């Protein structure tokens, strides 16, 4: 992959570089994904998650930018694994962009085949929001992480993480949310990463409080704050596959254990035990097969230590990076003895059509986001948990790139919020249009048996029709851009998922599109969980009037 040193930053204000606000939104969000404040390795087009890219290569990136600048408001641009391949006449209510990233026929859906194609320049890894142009930095996963640790606190620690120690690893674009999510819930956390740059970045953005290279110092500080029942987050430089076994040897058991290293990609994501970053990069280049094997062996040790901690009383869960699957394939037969975070903590929210709803101010003006915060506090005042989140986010979350906000809203709530935002753009309360989107990790848009659809009540974990239906209904309902990806979060062969983005530009046409899309999108989550037999989803569907032909 050619590295290009150039600083990409989305335009701000109301001057258009394109032929309409929807095209402008796509252009600005693509560029925002590659803003140095947002992307992990912008010079390689890598946004987050190992090698999750915004475009296949620099030639494709430039062609996408040129295409968006000339795209008419009744045309649709097609993007295949980060490369623009066609512009067709469509209509004004159709998506302006349709994206398909990293999709492989199931028999060939593995890292080896993907890498062959990538080497030939035929494919890229889109992760979830990297290739679909709606990544907003670490805030994008923060509330989900906050909700996860909050639910763990409610289930196991009396509603707060005060006086508890969480141990985790991985401080990249996704995992970097963990330290702040734990301290927001009142806890102490030691978060391990092999890359000092990742820890430094989280400290700079106020997601993590302190840095140390000493396990002794990390434990001393953690114990001191745990006894005081005060929150603190400690970024510890090191390899989790070495540090966790060392803690086991010392008979030190945290209260909560999880992991968000990039274990989904054994070649580009995980660093084997005994290697510096530089040595790992050299081995990756010279002997990728040996690198992958060493990574898998390290992951197995990592999971073994997590299992031992679980046996000693730690609340242990997988945070969706497929590390259990790797360890299982390496012969660790009890790797799945600790649950994934979705069945353990998040599924009830999915049954209500709730998920990580986000919006971005295309103006670049933080005031536009603060005004939308007030809408949440006013319109959803009865939801104290949600309002607390907004208040904390305002104080503690630093914007990366274009100002943005995330919060988990459910069926009915998303459409209501979208309507209000569009009206605020129309009457000039907001200085420019707002982009509304979400993660692919949502209630009705993903099939991922080791993560979002793990342990479904009816055994339908691997059924992948749902994300396809989600993309189809969002497209016909007029989403601004729609994406279908493979392998996000957990790696090749383990997930299919869909994304959508809708632009609130203040027009009446946008109001109608918003109403349709922000109803059908979370509606798919309710439908999917009704179909799987969840009573809470059935109650939600009946209460909200979701039309499900065979619902009992």
Curated annotation (Swiss-Prot):
Which pathway, metabolic or otherwise, does it act in? Amino-acid degradation; L-histidine degradation into L-glutamate; N-formimidoyl-L-glutamate from L-histidine: step 2/3
Q: Which UniProt keywords apply?
A: Cytoplasm, Histidine metabolism, Lyase, NAD
- Per the record, what are the reactions this protein catalyses? 4-imidazolone-5-propanoate = trans-urocanate + H2O
Compartment list: Cytoplasm
Report any one BP term from Gene Ontology.
Answer: L-histidine catabolic process to glutamate and formate
Which note does the record give on the cofactor?
Answer: Binds 1 NAD(+) per subunit.
Molecular function terms, GO-annotated: urocanate hydratase activity
List of catalytic residues: 407
Which PROSITE patterns does the protein's record reference?
UROCANASE
Needed cofactors, names only, are: NAD(+)
Q: Which residues form the signal peptide?
A: none
The record's annotation in InterPro entries points to:
Urocanase (IPR055351), Urocanase-like (IPR023637), Urocanase_C (IPR035401), Urocanase_central_sf (IPR038364), Urocanase_CS (IPR023636), Urocanase_N (IPR035400), Urocanase_Rossmann-like (IPR035085), Urocanase_sf (IPR036190)
Supply the EC number(s): 4.2.1.49
Statement: the UniProt record of this protein carries the keyword NAD: yes
GO cellular component terms listed in the entry, alphabetical order: cytoplasm
Residue positions binding NAD(+): 49-50, 127, 173-175, 193, 239-240, 260-264, 270-271, 319, 489
List the HAMAP family hit by this protein, alphabetically. Answer: HutU
Family that this chain belongs to: Belongs to the urocanase family.
Free-text function comment from the UniProt entry = Catalyzes the conversion of urocanate to 4-imidazolone-5-propionate.
The name this protein carries in UniProt is Urocanate hydratase
Native organism:
Bacillus cereus (strain AH187)
């Amino acid at each position: 992959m050619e590295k290009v040193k150039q600083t990409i930053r989305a335009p701000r204000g109301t001057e258009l570089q394109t032929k309409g606000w929807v095209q402008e939104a796509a252009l600005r969000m693509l560029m925002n994904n590659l803003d140095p404040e947002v992307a992990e390795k912008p010079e390689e087009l890598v946004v987050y998650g190992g090698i999750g890219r915004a475009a296949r290569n620099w030639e494709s990136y430039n062609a996408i930018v040129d295409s968006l600048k000339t795209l008419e408001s009744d045309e649709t641009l097609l993007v295949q694994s980060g490369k623009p391949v066609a512009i067709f006449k469509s209509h004004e209510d159709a998506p302006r962009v349709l994206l398909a990233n990293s999709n492989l026929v199931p028999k060939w859906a593995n890292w080896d085949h993907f890498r062959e194609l990538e080497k030939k320049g035929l494919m890229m890894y889109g992760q979830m929001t990297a290739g679909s142009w709606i990544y907003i930095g670490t805030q994008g996963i923060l509330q989900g992480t906050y909700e996860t640790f909050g639910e763990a606190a409610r289930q196991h620690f009396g509603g707060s993480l005060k006086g508890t120690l969480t141990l985790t690893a991985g401080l990249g674009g996704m995992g970097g949310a963990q330290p702040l999510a734990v301290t927001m819930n009142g806890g102490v956390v030691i978060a391990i990463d092999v890359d000092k740059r990742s820890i430094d970045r989280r400290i700079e953005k106020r997601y993590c409080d302190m840095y140390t290279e000493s396990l002794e110092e990390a434990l001393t500080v953690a114990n001191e704050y745990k006894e005081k029942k005060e929150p603190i987050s400690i970024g510890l430089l090191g390899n989790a596959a070495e540090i966790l076994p060392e803690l086991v040897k010392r008979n030190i058991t945290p209260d909560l254990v999880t992991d968000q290293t990039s274990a989904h990609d054994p070649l580009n994501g995980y660093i084997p035990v005994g290697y510096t970053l530089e040595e790992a990069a050299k081995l990756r280049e010279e002997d990728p097969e040996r690198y992958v094997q060493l990574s898998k062996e390290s992951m197995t040790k990592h999971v073994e230590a997590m299992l031992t901690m679980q046996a000693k009383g730690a609340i242990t869960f997988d945070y969706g990076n497929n590390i259990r699957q790797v360890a299982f394939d390496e012969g660790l037969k009890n790797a799945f003895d600790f649950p994934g975070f979705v069945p353990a903590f998040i599924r009830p929210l999915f049954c209500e059509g709730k998920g990580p709803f986000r919006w971005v101010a295309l103006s670049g003006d933080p005031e536009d986001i603060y005004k939308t915060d007030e809408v949440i506090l006013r319109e959803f005042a009865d939801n104290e948990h949600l309002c607390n989140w907004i208040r904390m986010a305002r104080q503690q979350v630093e914007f990366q790139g274009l100002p943005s906000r995330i919060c988990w809203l459910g069926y009915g709530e998303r459409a209501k919020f979208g309507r209000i935002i569009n009206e605020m753009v129309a009457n000039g309360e907001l200085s420019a249009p707002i982009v509304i989107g979400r993660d692919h990790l949502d209630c009705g848009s993903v099939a991922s048996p080791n993560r979002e659809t793990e342990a479904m009540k009816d055994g339908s974990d691997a059924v992948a029709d749902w994300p396809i239906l989600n993309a189809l209904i969002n497209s016909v309902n007029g989403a601004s851009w729609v994406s279908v990806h493979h392998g996000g979060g957990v790696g090749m062969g383990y997930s299919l998922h869909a994304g959508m983005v809708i632009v609130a530009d203040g027009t009446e046409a946008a109001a109608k599109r918003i109403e349709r899309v922000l109803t059908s999108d979370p509606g798919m989550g309710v439908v999917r969980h009704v179909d799987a037999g969840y009573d809470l989803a059935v109650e939600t569907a009946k209460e909200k009037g979701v039309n499900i032909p065979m619902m009992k």
